[in-house]
């Protein structure tokens, strides 16, 4: 069986990786995240498991320090002659340490940047075909939505259709969460919030987006507010739960904390006019959170 190694610096991608693995007959994934590499022994074990891999992908979050034992892994894989793809953020080291052809590197990067189960699956198929000699077909990278609605009971549902399932006699609460969590199917905490709201007699309206998106074709939290949370100037929700980690005051971004600004009160949430509650999430795994006495980090 052809083997592909995959390291991801965050656990956010593990949901889509796990689902992709279930679709890959004849392709075995060796997967680790930063939380799996507690010491050098763990790093060495990961590399040992990859010594006969068709290719290895190191999917970093920023620079080299987002992977424990990075230099050892790169040097050892180079010695073994294993094709290596390093995906970093903005640093030349990733290009330098990547050993596959530039065109292949760029295609793999596009799979990873677009993300989601379908792109992880076909990234692995591409690697297995091009570097493992596996007779398998693969699709080009697929563009996924950058904003939309989600509900655990209605996969792939659209905004209007989800609202049609609501009881008009019940309050409606929006649940804002990051597009990347929807893309990689990291939605258990969203599901839990939806279930909790519904058990208390409310309609749950989970919405994903990039809160400060400024790229063409992407809509931000202000657009979501104006188009999905307001109708004829009136709110269609009674409250919002937001798990975004940064300020939603879009026109105040970049302002010094000591400067109240000229328009601190004139932000798009004022147009909505309903309570917005900040929910607290953590990048740590549940097991690490439960075994720690330091609280949420």
Language model regions located:
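An N-terminal assembly and electron-transfer interface module characteristic of large anaerobic redox
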Residues: 1-297
């Amino acid at each position: 069986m052809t083997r592909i190694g995959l390291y991801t610096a965050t656990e956010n991608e593990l949901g889509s990786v796990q689902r992709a693995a279930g679709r890959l007959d004849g392709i075995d994934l060796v997967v680790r995240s930063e939380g799996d590499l507690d010491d050098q022994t763990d790093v060495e074990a990961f590399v040992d498991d990859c010594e006969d891999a068709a290719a290895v992908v190191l999917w970093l979050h920023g620079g080299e320090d987002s992977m424990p034992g990075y230099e050892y892994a790169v040097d050892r894989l180079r010695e073994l002659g294993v094709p290596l793809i390093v995906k970093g953020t903005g640093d030349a080291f990733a290009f330098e340490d990547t050993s596959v052809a530039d065109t292949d590197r760029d295609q793999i990067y596009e799979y990873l940047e677009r993300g989601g189960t379908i792109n992880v699956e076909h990234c692995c198929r591409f690697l297995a075909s091009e570097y493992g000699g596996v007779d398998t077909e693969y699709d080009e990278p697929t563009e996924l939505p950058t904003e939309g609605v989600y509900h655990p009971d209605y996969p792939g549902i659209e905004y209007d259709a989800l609202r049609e399932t609501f009881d008009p006699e019940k309050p409606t609460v929006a649940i804002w969460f990051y597009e990347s969590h929807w893309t990689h199917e990291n939605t258990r905490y969203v599901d839990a919030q939806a279930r909790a709201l519904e058990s208390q007699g409310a309609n749950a309206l989970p919405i994903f987006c990039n809160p400060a998106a400024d790229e063409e074709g992407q809509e931000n939290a202000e657009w979501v507010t104006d188009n999905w949370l307001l109708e004829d100037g009136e709110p269609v929700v009674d409250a919002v739960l937001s798990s975004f980690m940064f300020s939603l005051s879009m026109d105040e971004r970049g302002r010094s904390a000591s400067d109240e600004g000229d328009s601190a009160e004139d932000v798009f949430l004022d147009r909505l006019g309903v309570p917005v509650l900040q929910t607290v999430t953590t990048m740590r795994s549940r097991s690490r959170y439960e075994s720690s006495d330091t609280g949420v980090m």
